[in-house]
Amino acid sequence: MRKNAAPKRPVVKDPVYNSEQVTMLVNKILRDGKKSTAERIVYGALEVCREKTGTDPVGTLEKALGNIRPDLEVRSRRVGGATYQVPVEVKPARSNTLALRWLVTFTRQRRENSMIERLANEILDASNGLGASVKRREDTHKMAEANRAFAHYRW
């Protein structure tokens, strides 16, 4: 086990939109080390968002991530032979990571033709409070609410 937490590395801001969130999204989309392909997908999707909404695409992305970010989650805790799902608050960094992970996961599951279309539509849906990634957040919150009785086991 690690003696102490690894230091958080600073996120370099994206050169096009000057945003840390965009950089993190590019890194989440990244597969097989093909960063230029990942950047093309993200920038293309943000351009589609700009065309469809007529507003700043980074603002739309921020709004979408805000609608996806969970406040609570459940963690398993063993107490005397029984495993309880204990609701705990989510730290901001983890909340952001989960939001990006869910956004990309559900983008990949969509049925549009290109990845650019899928990502753009998932971002737009999430910014409007719709879509599978927002549903995932709601499910996580419901699970935490249902297990509220075990909140006194939190650590």
UniProtKB/Swiss-Prot annotation:
UniProt keyword annotations, A-Z: Ribonucleoprotein, Ribosomal protein, RNA-binding, rRNA-binding, tRNA-binding
Pfam families, per the entry: Ribosomal_S7
One Gene Ontology MF term: rRNA binding
BP GO terms, sorted: translation
Entry's Gene Ontology cellular component terms: small ribosomal subunit
InterPro entries: Ribosomal_uS7 (IPR000235), Ribosomal_uS7_bac/org-type (IPR005717), Ribosomal_uS7_dom (IPR023798), Ribosomal_uS7_dom_sf (IPR036823)
NCBIfam families: rpsG_bact (TIGR01029)
HAMAP family membership: Ribosomal_uS7_B
Function text: One of the primary rRNA binding proteins, it binds directly to 16S rRNA where it nucleates assembly of the head domain of the 30S subunit. Is located at the subunit interface close to the decoding center, probably blocks exit of the E-site tRNA.
Protein family according to the UniProt entry: Belongs to the universal ribosomal protein uS7 family.
Quaternary structure annotation from Swiss-Prot or TrEMBL: Part of the 30S ribosomal subunit. Contacts proteins S9 and S11.
Protein name: Small ribosomal subunit protein uS7
Species whose genome carries this gene: Corynebacterium aurimucosum (strain ATCC 700975 / DSM 44827 / CIP 107346 / CN-1) (Corynebacterium nigricans)
Organism classification: Bacteria, Bacillati, Actinomycetota, Actinomycetes, Mycobacteriales
